[in-house]
């Protein structure tokens, strides 16, 4: 299947660009040299195997040997791994399952935390620094605008459904209904106990 090599090559290119370009990250990279990290994403049949060497990281779709560390998680958790402060929290909450040498994933998260993921760096060799930075700002601004627009439309839809069209109850109506239901339940319980007492006499 040609899709698998395309995905692994794309991820490999991104990781090598951000993690192996800067000489300042050399000490963090040496801790991972010779290590194999396997990332299994729930919902995906193909694991990603990261093989670290002195000059690059190789991303493979399969690995015959045994990985030093295997990480099992959801794809939505991967962006959180850029912050090394969250690693312990993710493991405790069960969002991230680590098998094998935990030091490997700790070193990888530390390296990712030190690396600066800036899309302008990818564009700079082709467009120049100023144009790349300008394009990056426009893209970030556009993404922020779209995110806020989506959240606003979500709010509008929720208000229309609950307030205008009355297709669903509002939050206060739900709370009132829950209180009334609890009151009826308490009344039925007290009536049941009174009836049981009367029947016992």
From Swiss-Prot:
Subcellular location: Cytoplasm
A biological process from GO: ubiquinone biosynthetic process
The keyword Cytoplasm belongs to this UniProt entry's keyword annotation: yes
Entry GO terms, CC: cytoplasm
Domain of life: Bacteria
Domain SCP2: 15-112
Annotated keywords: Cytoplasm, Ubiquinone biosynthesis
Signal peptide start and end residues: none
Keyword Phosphoprotein: no
Main location: cytoplasm
Pathway it works in: Cofactor biosynthesis; ubiquinone biosynthesis
Effect of deleting the gene: During aerobic growth, mutant is impaired for ubiquinone biosynthesis and for growth in rich medium, but it does not present any defect under anaerobic conditions. Mutant is also impaired for Salmonella intracellular proliferation in macrophages.
Family of this protein: Belongs to the UbiJ family.
Cited function: Required for ubiquinone (coenzyme Q) biosynthesis under aerobic conditions. Binds hydrophobic ubiquinone biosynthetic intermediates via its SCP2 domain and is essential for the stability of the Ubi complex. May constitute a docking platform where Ubi enzymes assemble and access their SCP2-bound polyprenyl substrates. Required for intracellular proliferation in macrophages.
Protein name: Ubiquinone biosynthesis accessory factor UbiJ
Biological source species: Salmonella typhimurium (strain LT2 / SGSC1412 / ATCC 700720)
């Amino acid at each position: 299947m040609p899709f698998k090599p395309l995905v692994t090559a794309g991820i490999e290119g991104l990781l090598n660009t951000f993690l192996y370009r800067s000489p300042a990250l050399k000490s963090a990279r040496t801790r991972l040299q010779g290590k194999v990290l396997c990332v299994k994403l729930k919902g995906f049949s193909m694991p990603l195997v990261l093989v670290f060497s002195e000059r690059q990281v190789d991303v493979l779709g399969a690995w015959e040997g045994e990985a030093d560390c295997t990480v099992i998680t959801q794809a939505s958790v991967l962006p959180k791994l850029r912050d090394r402060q969250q690693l312990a929290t993710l493991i405790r909450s069960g969002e991230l399952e680590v098998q094998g040498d935990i030091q490997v994933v700790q070193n990888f998260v530390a390296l990712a935390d030190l690396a600066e993921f800036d899309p302008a760096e990818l564009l700079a060799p082709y467009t120049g620094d100023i144009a790349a930075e300008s394009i990056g700002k426009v893209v970030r601004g556009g993404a922020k605008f779209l995110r806020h627009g989506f959240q606003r439309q979500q709010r509008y839809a929720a208000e229309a459904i609950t307030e205008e069209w009355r297709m669903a109850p509002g939050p206060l109506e739900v709370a009132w209904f829950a209180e009334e239901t609890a009151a009826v339940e308490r009344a039925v319980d007290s009536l049941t106990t009174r009836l049981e007492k009367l029947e016992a006499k």
